[in-house]
UniProtKB/Swiss-Prot annotation:
3-dehydroquinate binds at E29, F30, R31, R56, R180, S200, Q204. This is 3-dehydroquinate dehydratase. It catalyses: 3-dehydroquinate = 3-dehydroshikimate + H2O. Pathway: Metabolic intermediate biosynthesis; chorismate biosynthesis; chorismate from D-erythrose 4-phosphate and phosphoenolpyruvate: step 3/7. Its EC number is 4.2.1.10. Homodimer. PANTHER family: 3-DEHYDROQUINATE DEHYDRATASE. One of its GO terms (molecular function) is 3-dehydroquinate dehydratase activity. It comes from Methanococcus maripaludis (strain C6 / ATCC BAA-1332). Involved in the third step of the chorismate pathway, which leads to the biosynthesis of aromatic amino acids. Catalyzes the cis-dehydration of 3-dehydroquinate (DHQ) and introduces the first double bond of the aromatic ring to yield 3-dehydroshikimate. Pfam families: DHquinase_I. Gene3D superfamilies: Aldolase class I.
Amino acid sequence: MICIPVIDENVSDAINSAKEALKYGDIVEFRVDLLNDVTFEDIEKFSKIPSILTIRAEWEGGAWKKSDNERIELLKYAIKNNAKFIDIELKEERNLELVKYRNEIGSKTKIIVSYHDFEKTPEIDELIDVVEKELKIGDIAKFATFAHSKEDTLKILNLMNKYSGKIIAIGMGESGKLTRILGLDFGSILTFASMEGKASAPGQVDVKKLKEILELIE
């Protein structure tokens, strides 16, 4: 799957951007933390669109400035409305609460548990530990680390291969671009690409260019 982040500041723009993005990608990621304001009704609208709902905490590189309790309640509402995916941080102390809620109500939402390192790619043993912890909590493990070298890129690709079908792994930065291009072949369930001029992370590839490259590889 190709996932395109939606990074607009108001809800109507976000929904319009999502509709346009889905002409090129398979799903979108609504970065709810970047919106100026969001209601439960908005979450319901987003949940009807093939998407990942992410309300990234400020302490994990996001923009969510309101209470953690409000964030958790919005994510629960997404689960209640059977959003395709939600993303919650490994460091979020209440992540198991969301899984328990999903299971109790019989929601179809898949839960992605994520980890970010914006400075480096840790050693492979540390990354394995992260992925194992994530998979004990949610359905899909995700990590995004900053790749500084070919060695970092190889580490990330190796882990995609090891956890094929239950991982999303990303090497941020120029050195990590190969992880975005080869990710699907190595076992990542999706790769992120951006609409022109709307990248949400360093090294994100334009979706039209990515599709051209993937067609050449095939």
